[in-house]
Amino acid sequence: MRKQSGFTVIELIITILVLASAGVIFLVQKNNLSAGHRDTQRKTAINAIYYNLEEIVYPKLGGYPATLDAKQLKAMDSELLKDPNGTAIGESGSDYSYEPSSCNGDICEHYVLRASLEREAAFERKSRN
């Protein structure tokens, strides 16, 4: 009898299972890294808005605006007012929120900036004053 060369069915199944497991692990890690990157983008945007409000807007107005848009925050890139999905702060479904309080007309005394994160609890920055 001649011995046939090739792989047995069991060897093929084991190889397929190992490759499938490696693929699943790769996809899970990729998704975790992507979510972490988006969370970092959200934190960066909230910090940029926060420092713009504290260092530029507050000294100029003597308070904080009742609503946020690119007109009030001229010292920063207006794209930072949009979350990673492209939804602007204040719009329905945005990951970012601006909640002013103690308002007198268009000027407010306090605010809370908030970003909903995928991998952590919400990221918040509150007014200094």
Each model region followed by its residue ranges:
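Short, glycine/small-hydrophobic-rich surface segments
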Residues: 53-85, 129
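Residue-level detector of conserved, well-ordered beta-strand and adjacent loop positions
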Residues: 65, 99, 114
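N-terminal "domain-start" segment
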Residues: 22, 26-36, 51-55, 69
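Membrane-proximal N-terminal amphipathic helix
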Residues: 34-62
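Short, surface-exposed beta-strand/loop micro-motifs that present aromatic residues
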Residues: 90-105
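Short, surface-exposed interaction loops/tails
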Residues: 103-129
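N-terminal single-pass transmembrane signal-anchor helix
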Residues: 2-30
